[in-house]
Amino acid sequence: MEKKKNNNNGGDFGEEESSIDGDILESILSYLPLLDLDSACQVSKSWNRAVFYSLRRLKTMPWLFVYNQRNSPPYTMATMAMAYDPKSEAWIELNTASSPVEHVSVARSSHSTLLYALSPARFSFSTDAFHLTWQHVAPPRVWRIDPIVAVVGRSLIIAGGVCDFEEDRFAVELFDIESGDGAWERCESMPDFLYESASSTWLSVAVSSEKMYVTEKRSGVTCSFNPVTRSWTKLLDLCPGECSLYSRSIGFSVNRLIMAGIIGDEYNPTGIELWEVIDSDESHLKFESIGSMPETYLEKLRGINSDWPLTSIVLNAVGDMVYVHGAAENGGEIVAAEIEGGKLCKWRTLPNADATWKKSHAAERVIVACSNVGFSDLKLAFRNNLSFLSTSKY
């Protein structure tokens, strides 16, 4: 039987059709990592159609991103970043032709998906999956050093972290991203029970589609901010009765408020527990245990034979994945787990995390973020000339 030629010139697809049944091919493709799906699109017209239909079955899994930025002026973001794709269980090297943005201050991450940088001249932030697009707006009216920042719907919120010479240490400002008027609006100030901790150093932040949640890492004192009413609501403390926590971190996974808490003390942490926090009634919080970090992974998170205290942890929760690592860059590994049926499973430390996590130069700082990455996000990244280089799993 004569074999058909595949004349794939100038990006046109060949005429040879796949011999695999359409439904079977779609099912197979739905298990592939996104980068492999992009390659599959180029095989033939039938494969391109199969990829399109397989996206209906595709379970989107959030990627973890590790960025580097200079510690001193100019605060340039490195043109290379690393991303962990949980579906392929591999790190992917990301390269851009030039730095995404030139900052005049350090960039930070908040509630997993937001990157931002604050300077006297402007406020810059990015929420797209690969953080290739940055928006620049006027700086807040109140000067701040270490505020908490969040994006809830169309509202950009900045609170606390106020300089000593300002009158209101708890000042809150809101910027309507879609209004186009370019003005910050003053809102109800942060609750006074956060007097000793009204900055991002001491607070953990999570966002739902409607509210920003803020908890004091040490005490568990918690409140929420509603951008529609511009007001705060005091919630019960995030202190599960059965556990004594010395630090906690919060995040939002789908529609669930997730809390990770450390048991023991800084020099002898004995466990990390995770709960879903249900706040349907603001006068009563319910804590549903979703899992305990295995002891071996706790040791790797802290750093094998490490003498560093584990003062606090960072929780990145997006979709059905959680990523946990120490707040200090002390060489510990990143621990990941999936949420299935409301419980944590498939615990792992990220392969090659040791090399990726520690390779930052002394003159650079590490910024960690997390995003749901879909096929459309990948295509947009290609159009923005972002290149991908898959690395080995081991």
UniProtKB/Swiss-Prot annotation:
One annotated Gene Ontology cellular component of this protein = cytosol
Q: Is Ribosomal protein given among the entry's keywords?
A: no
Matching Gene3D superfamilies: 1.20.1280.50, Kelch-type beta propeller
State the Kelch repeat positions: 65-111, 155-204, 206-252, 321-369
A single Pfam family it belongs to is F-box-like
The alphabetical list of record keywords is:
Kelch repeat, Repeat
Q: Does the keyword Repeat apply?
A: yes
User: What SMART domains does the record tag this protein with?
Assistant: FBOX
What is the name attached to this protein's record? Answer: F-box/kelch-repeat protein At1g23390
Q: Which organism is it from?
A: Arabidopsis thaliana (Mouse-ear cress)
